A protein has these predicted regions:
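Bacterial Sec-dependent N-terminal signal peptides
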Residues: 1-23
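Carbohydrate-binding surfaces of carbohydrate-active enzymes
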Residues: 22-25, 33-34, 42, 258, ...
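Short alpha-helical segments and helix-capping/turn motifs at coil-helix boundaries
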Residues: 25-27, 33-36, 72-74, 80-82, ...
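Mature N-terminal segment immediately following signal peptide/propeptide cleavage
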Residues: 29-51
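A low-complexity, Ser/Thr/Gly/Pro-enriched, surface-exposed linker/loop concept
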Residues: 43-82
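Catalytic and substrate-binding clefts that recognize carbohydrates or anionic sugar/phosphate headgroups
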Residues: 79-233, 243-244, 249, 256-261
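Conserved, mostly hydrophobic/aromatic
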Residues: 91, 157, 259, 311, ...
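Aromatic- and carboxylate-enriched substrate-binding clefts and catalytic-loop regions
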Residues: 117, 125, 265-521
Length: 548
């Protein structure tokens, strides 16, 4: 079979390794200009932060989107007269009518403008100006997508043929999922930065980026303020085995034998949700458990620690799938429910269940200490956070998905490990928490056709580590040629993970297909394995050079 000719490797360009540890959210005072209730921070020659607060309360803490504002000082000129303040770098010219709100209704250039040069012509921007030429970013999920029916959900990215883009980090500027960009503050109880309300919820907080067609520089400078894109552990560059199916321990052993027999280099083994009691007869759960579960289904996997050790002995890293929304039930392992009930003093529990409150520090600490630590001591390396319950929680405007990604990633970082998590996209700033799970797509040629575009535009918001269900997840149709082509695309996508729904007929194991398809799929997977040193080296070089 011919190889699919896609220039998707370009989507891996923004990958860099860095940490958020050395970030400083307080800008150098020499980069700041205050004019009444307005504050301007010159971050780069092309990027200016614009704040306005009627209360004169500006934000110097990190936020969900921006974590660093202390950049190398930029030469700029400032002058003012009775009516206007002017700020000019060698790339942008800002003009602000003193004593006014930069935003007008309807949007107009009356109170604030920024002028840039784009393709040899002057371009004027003002707050609220629409941009029909934005090259787009990404969206929360491809769940239920068939072809490009999610195209309209793509959020704006940081690059545009207009020559400018804006990050609106104001509290009132709700994200695409309806949530807000909270501030972050240290929390001694959990040991991580915790969400906090903004100083002035009505304040304007914009980051203007006037980079013209210097697209790489725009993304690179975004990561200077929003945090670098970490380099995950080396094993993520290989092939991930994944299937939603009620496998027993012996089934997993047979899969490992087939993988070895067929000489398929494999680095990650994912155990989907049937590892725990889920209430389904098909998984021998005896009406115990449900969509959410934390305790091993010992009918299928009677000796979990032994199985995980065997998987490790075969050279795989291990992830477990989680749907956490229903909390901790009393039918779970007594050590989980009782320990958390005791520590939380019944605070979040009723009717034999501890409700899900990851947005509160005492719950978070107890959950990680009792549930996550226990499974990781058994051999779990990372977690697949399969959150599908929307963007609402007890704290208005706080997206639980962002909380999951933030805390699971930081927790996975302990003991000096190179961290990672595996979850859906939760808005700008999510690039700090790789890897992304794009969701449940239909098995169609149209879905394959859209995936390279979707993967590439995500890098326009710095989000380079999408993991797709290669081959599609559900519905659609069975087509050997489609599976082979999708697998061939997969080796050039950021993460190579074949996956499928819980159907007898949807398995993506190469040995389930006719000979021609099997050989094409296995050749692709071996090719991906050969690329690991290159992929890792190039990403490492980029990280050391601090380039996007």
């Amino acid at each position: 079979m011919k190889w699919i000719g896609l220039a998707v490797m370009l989507s891996m360009a923004p990958f860099v390794r860095a940490t958020v540890d050395n970030n400083n959210p307080i800008a150098n005072s020499k980069a700041v200009v205050i004019c009444g209730n307005a504050r301007f921070t010159v971050l780069t020659p092309e990027m200016i932060r614009i704040e306005y607060s009627e209360k004169g309360m500006f934000e110097d803490r990190p936020t969900f989107t921006v974590v660093n504002r202390n950049l190398e000082l930029v030469d700029f000129k400032k002058k003012e007269d009775d009516r206007f303040l002017y700020i000019q770098t060698d790339k942008v010219k800002l003009k602000y009518r003193k004593g006014t709100n930069p935003k007008t209704s309807p949007a107009s250039p009356e109170n604030l403008t920024i002028t840039i040069e784009n393709h040899g012509c002057e371009t004027l921007w003002y707050p609220g100006k629409k941009d029909p030429l934005n090259l787009k970013g990404t969206c929360r999920t491809l769940d239920g997508s068939n072809g490009d029916n999610k195209r309209s959900e793509l959020e704006n990215g940081l690059i545009s043929r207009s020559g400018w883009a804006v990050i609106d980090d104001s509290w009132e500027a709700t994200r695409a999922d309806g949530s807000h960009s909270f501030a972050l503050e240290p929390n001694l109880e959990v040991g991580y930065d915790w969400w906090a309300y903004r100083n002035d919820p009505q304040a304007i907080d914009l980051y203007f980026m006037g980079y013209g067609n210097e697209y790489k520089k725009a993304i690179g400078d975004f990561t200077k303020i929003a945090g670098k894109i970490p380099l995950p552990p080396a094993y993520v560059f290989g092939y991930w085995y994944s299937r939603y199916y009620s496998y027993s321990a012996d089934d997993y052993r047979e899969i490992m034998r087939e993988i070895e027999k067929n000489d398929i280099p494999t680095d990650v083994m994912i155990l989907d949700m049937d590892w725990h009691w889920n209430g389904k007869a098909s998984s021998e759960s005896e009406n115990i458990g449900g969509w959410t579960g934390w305790s091993w289904n010992t009918n299928l996997i009677p000796e979990p620690t032994k199985l995980l050790q065997e998987i490790h002995d075969n050279g795989y890293k291990i992830a477990l799938n989680l749907h956490p929304a229903d909390g901790i039930d009393s039918i779970e392992s007594p050590s989980y429910y009782k320990a958390m009930s005791r520590e939380l003093e019944g605070k979040y529990g009723s009717d034999g269940k501890i409700a899900w409150y990851l947005d509160y520090p005492d719950f978070t600490k107890s959950f990680f200490d009792n549930v996550i630590r226990d499974h990781e001591s058994e051999g779990v390396d990372f977690w697949w956070i399969d959150w599908q319950q929307g963007s609402n929680c007890k704290v208005e405007g706080l997206d639980p998905l962002w909380i999951f990604n933030h805390f699971h990633y930081l927790d996975n970082k302990r003991d000096g490990r190179r961290p990672m998590t595996f979850s859906r996209y939760a808005g700008p700033g999510s690039h700090r928490y790789p890897i992304g799970f794009s969701g449940d797509t239909h098995i169609t040629w149209e879905s394959l056709d859209f995936q390279p575009y979707f993967t590439t535009t995500a890098t326009n918001i710095g989000y380079g580590w999408w993991s797709h269900d290669i081959g599609g997840h559900m519905l659609g149709y069975k087509d050997d040629e489609l599976t082979a082509r999708w697998t061939q695309y997969g080796i050039f996508s950021p993460i190579m993970r074949l996956h499928s729904s819980c159907s007898e007929f949807n398995g993506k194991e190469p040995w389930r297909f006719k000979k021609e398809t099997e050989e094409a799929m296995e050749a692709a997977l071996r090719q991906r394995h050969c690329m690991i040193p290159y992929l890792y080296t190039m990403n490492y070089r980029k990280s050391e050079a601090k380039r996007s």
